[in-house]
Amino acid sequence: AALLILVSCSNQTDNFEYPESNKVPFSEEVHGYVIEDAYRWMEDFTSEDSTDWVERQNNFTQKFIGKNKYKKSIAKNLDEVWDTDSISMPYQVNKKTFYYFNDGSWQQSKLMIKDCDECSERVLLDPNKFSEDGTISLASTSVSNDASLLAFSISDGGSDWRTWKVLDIESGKTLDDRIEWAKFSGASWENDDSGFYYQRYDEPSEELLKD
């Protein structure tokens, strides 16, 4: 599939004009060094310039893909590759084994657990049931040292914002604990499993969330 993509790109690149990315002079001094960054304006992702840039890039991409004569064959090859069982590297915590499994038909892999070496596997967490439309995904997990609790974060609609929850591993029930507005953060359990460390932000303004 990768070879087909490269060939199709070389055949069509000359027929397209890439959207320009404006360079806006900007510099700042950081620890005694002057940093030049002509694309700093892109960091304001809610600005009119940024949203216009994203729209032009998306339009260019869709125009290219739409005219790609290998589109259907590539999609067919990818479906064949993905339509198969897959299992992640298992890991153990306090003699319990955890791993992700997908039979090829699920949108998201399920988190499985074996409570002991001789025990049968069971589904610990099924992110496919988080929402009916499949827009809520499992982002990351962290098992407590005694393997009694699972901290897991979810993402809604592909957002970088994460909501952390805690699952009782034995009962499979989600506890009332809930941490919102986390981003780019893991969960590190205390040695005595009394809690875990994480990073979060203040709740964004409604205006920012709408954008």
What role is predicted for each listed range?
Residues 8-211:
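Beta-propeller folds
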